[in-house]
Regions:
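PLP-dependent class I/II
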Residues: 1-167
Length: 167
């Protein structure tokens, strides 16, 4: 199990995480390799960041629960909105606050579509190819924003796609 403070406690950029490993010979060999790879990540976490992590875990969790509920609502708005757009399909994300919709049905390549949406409609997306060779045909959209802004972005995307602009 790998996790961190980024999403549950909104500590993105603090770069602090943790892992749990089973106690077996097989996992022991893998654990040793991962530890050698990751030692620079955890050995350099400064003291204030560590104390902030402790406070996040030990402190009241009410705000975390409210934040998670808000992200759940936003995720539903994003998925429903993206699935309403012509040529776009989106499965419900399960772990992060990003959606990765398939845009192949629009006839556009991912990165040119992301650029056109930014330049013409002010909607910031990232082309799937930036995440690896299998990313073509996908965009990444963050829903770490207000529902109002998310709905505005979906409206602008709909307007762009309805424009019949050549790709």
């Amino acid at each position: 199990v790998l996790n961190g403070w980024s999403k549950p406690w909104a500590m993105t950029g603090w770069r602090m995480g943790w892992s749990i490993w089973p106690n077996s010979a097989e996992s022991g060999r893998l654990h040793d390799k991962v530890r050698k790879l990751a030692v620079n990540c955890w050995s350099c976490v400064n003291a204030p960041t560590q104390y902030a992590g402790i406070a996040a875990i030990d402190g009241p969790q009410d705000e975390v629960d409210r934040m998670m509920a808000a992200f759940d609502r936003r995720r539903k708005v994003v998925v429903e909105g993206l699935n309403s757009l012509p040529g776009i399909s989106c499965i419900t994300p399960k772990g992060a606050f990003y959606a990765f919709p398939n845009v192949a049905g629009t006839g556009w390549k991912a990165k040119p579509l992301a650029s056109a949406l930014l330049e013409e409609k002010g909607v910031a997306l990232i082309g799937g190819p930036d995440f690896g060779v299998h990313g073509e045909g996908y965009l990444r959209l963050s829903y770490a924003n207000s529902e109002e802004n998310i709905l505005r972005a979906i409206e602008r995307m709909a307007d762009f796609l309805a424009g019949g602009r050549p790709h």
